[in-house]
Amino acid sequence: MQRHAIILAAGKGTRMKSKKYKVLHEVAGKPMVEHVLNNVKQAGVDQIVTIIGHGAESVKDTLGNQSLYSFQDKQLGTAHAVKMAHEHLADKEGTTLVVCGDTPLITYQTLQSLIEHHESTQSHVTVLSASTINPYGYGRIIRNHNGILERIVEEKDANDSERAIKEISSGIFAFNNRVLFEKLEQVKNDNAQGEYYLPDVLSLILKDGGKAEVYCTEDFDEIIGVNDRLMLSEAEKALQQRINRYHMENGVTIIDPSSTFIGTDVKIGIDTTIEPGVRIGGHTTIEEDVWIGQYSEINNSTIHSNANIKQSVINDSIVGENTTVGPFAQLRPGSNLGSEVKVGNFVEVKKADIKDGAKVSHLSYIGDAEIGERTNIGCGSITVNYDGANKFKTIVGKDAFIGCNTNLIAPVTVGNHTLIAAGSTITDNIPEDSLALARARQVNKEGYLKK
């Protein structure tokens, strides 16, 4: 059976009080609508249509060709939004999942279970529900005395007894696709808001003797809809708890989960320890037995086994086995550290290969460079890579010793097993096995200050 999905992402999100459109606000480092799309895909859906309106181009830029798109010019309610997918889905057979783009905590497992329940019961519509102590703002699930679904009533249209019901609609549905688009034509807007409600499709199906089911999830957090900054923070907290719990259950020590932020695409090996205040995001892979020190930030990087990261910032870089970074170091994009490398305090590395066993221990800048095996870069040494218009490369061979406060004026090559005297400014290539001195001779003028 074919499976389709419609993601509702057209709303502006006025309560967010933001220039950014609601579904593009991030949770765990990723736009909410992207979380939704990823889980819809994992649920086994064949075709996705995203309904866009406010911020249409920004949403399309975020999701790219992972989805088809239909434009909702005026936001006239959820049924009206779903109807916009007519051009892509109206003539299709199968099941159509409808999901709101502001529900970043929904999991693919729950969506899978909803679809499977819908198809196994041969229903025309199945609604995903949950129970909560505080159902304010959600549509209520109304059942008859036999527990069978009768209708869904929105908060603003509910009477006092209906508002007291704790089982709520998530706004997520599975429909028989042909029935969905047939009934959408019959939905009216005679309600308090003057909008076309998607739950009215369910009422029309029941009125015509169709079959409606409810699938209840036990995790209310999954269906949280984010409408304001407070709910955004609640969603962030809930997703971080879920992510951190997953890693701890799989052998990672997180000393203070409440202050540790890990993205959904991060992979972490067993026996790695993460201290408080750490942020790890993007497509980062951390292997086994790594120590991530407090307040470190790592994005889109690979950290190999037994590395030790101390209070440092690492972006788009590779850190080798048994390598130490920090404290207070920065690896900028394109940094590649080999095994048993030391990059120490207040060192900045950018677009550089630092080979196995090399050391850059203090107060240095290494940019657009290649540093050979076991070479030592002295304190305060820098590669001077930029002339105001272009950047140039510095190559330092293996087993070299670069004295403190050395300036390597690129482009320049320093051979294997060389020694550069402290305080030198190197402008010419240095042959291997050489000593290079490039500094003015010291002159003492005795008694000068007594004049």
From Swiss-Prot:
GO molecular function list: glucosamine-1-phosphate N-acetyltransferase activity; magnesium ion binding; UDP-N-acetylglucosamine diphosphorylase activity
Co-factor note (free text): Binds 1 Mg(2+) ion per subunit.
Linker: annotated segments: 230-250
Entry's EC annotation: 2.7.7.23, 2.3.1.157
Residue numbers binding UDP-N-acetyl-alpha-D-glucosamine: 8-11, 22, 72, 77-78, 139, 154, 227, 332, 350, 365, 376
UniProt-listed Pfam families: Hexapep, NTP_transferase
Names of the cofactor(s): Mg(2+)
Domain of life: Bacteria
Cited SUPFAM superfamilies: Nucleotide-diphospho-sugar transferases (SSF53448), Trimeric LpxA-like enzymes (SSF51161)
UniProt enzyme class: transferase
InterPro entries reported in the protein's UniProt record: Bifunctional_GlmU, GlmU-like, GlmU_C_LbH, Hexapep, Hexapep_transf_CS, NTP_transferase_dom, Nucleotide-diphossugar_trans, Trimer_LpxA-like_sf
Region annotation (N-acetyltransferase) ranges: 251-451
Localization: Cytoplasm
Catalytic reactions of this protein: alpha-D-glucosamine 1-phosphate + acetyl-CoA = N-acetyl-alpha-D-glucosamine 1-phosphate + CoA + H(+); N-acetyl-alpha-D-glucosamine 1-phosphate + UTP + H(+) = UDP-N-acetyl-alpha-D-glucosamine + diphosphate
GO terms, biological process: cell morphogenesis; cell wall organization; lipid A biosynthetic process; peptidoglycan biosynthetic process; regulation of cell shape; UDP-N-acetylglucosamine biosynthetic process
GO CC terms in record: cytoplasm; membrane
Task of the protein: Catalyzes the last two sequential reactions in the de novo biosynthetic pathway for UDP-N-acetylglucosamine (UDP-GlcNAc). The C-terminal domain catalyzes the transfer of acetyl group from acetyl coenzyme A to glucosamine-1-phosphate (GlcN-1-P) to produce N-acetylglucosamine-1-phosphate (GlcNAc-1-P), which is converted into UDP-GlcNAc by the transfer of uridine 5-monophosphate (from uridine 5-triphosphate), a reaction catalyzed by the N-terminal domain.
Quaternary organization: Homotrimer.
Name by which UniProt lists this protein: Bifunctional protein GlmU
